[in-house]
Amino acid sequence: MTKTKQEIYNKRPTSPHLTIYKPQISSTLSILHRMTGVALFFAVSILAWWFILSKFDSNYIKLANCCCIIKICLILTSFAWFYHLCNGIRHLFWDIGLGFSIKAVNLTGWSVVICSVLFTILLWV
């Protein structure tokens, strides 16, 4: 490149970096929906395997009652389940063309998070 072309190349605008990007509720929930989908795949696979093992040895059930880490994993799995369910219902409304305004997207997004937390609390209390 000639000197002028290099100067022009260096002065061209670049896209904003992730450090200055402010995440929006819709983008955050979209990423969370994908993460919970992957997490549920693994969690349900492990739970199925665990239930099969508990059929032959009851110590696996006792382990779940006494181990805090397993209980925390089960609570997080139930939150992921409820979040994925509530957000899936939200997507069904989008499929029929409802709730596309910015206000509706933000309102339903926060509603999904609040309902997921409430359903998880109701399940475990």
From Swiss-Prot:
Main localization category: membrane
Pathway the protein acts in: Carbohydrate metabolism; tricarboxylic acid cycle
Highest taxon above the source species: Bacteria
Subcellular locations according to the entry: Cell inner membrane
Keywords on record: Cell inner membrane, Cell membrane, Electron transport, Heme, Iron, Membrane, Metal-binding, Transmembrane, Transmembrane helix, Transport, Tricarboxylic acid cycle
Membrane-spanning parts: 30-55, 69-89, 105-125
Topology, Cytoplasmic side: 1-29, 90-104
Gene Ontology BP, a term: tricarboxylic acid cycle
GO MF term (any one): electron transfer activity
Cofactor notes: The heme is bound between the two transmembrane subunits.
Pfam family, one: Sdh_cyt
Topological relation to the membrane, as annotated: Multi-pass membrane protein
Known cofactor(s): heme
Residues given in the record as heme binding sites: H84
Cellular component annotations (GO), alphabetically ordered: plasma membrane
Periplasmic compartment residues: 56-68
Family statement: Belongs to the cytochrome b560 family.
Stated role: Membrane-anchoring subunit of succinate dehydrogenase (SDH).
UniProt cross-references to PANTHER family, sorted A to Z: SUCCINATE DEHYDROGENASE CYTOCHROME B560 SUBUNIT (PTHR10978), SUCCINATE DEHYDROGENASE CYTOCHROME B560 SUBUNIT, MITOCHONDRIAL (PTHR10978:SF5)
Subunit record text: Part of an enzyme complex containing four subunits: a flavoprotein, an iron-sulfur protein, plus two membrane-anchoring proteins, SdhC and SdhD. The complex can form homotrimers.
Name listed for the protein in its UniProt record: Succinate dehydrogenase cytochrome b556 subunit
Species lineage: Bacteria, Pseudomonadati, Pseudomonadota, Alphaproteobacteria, Rickettsiales
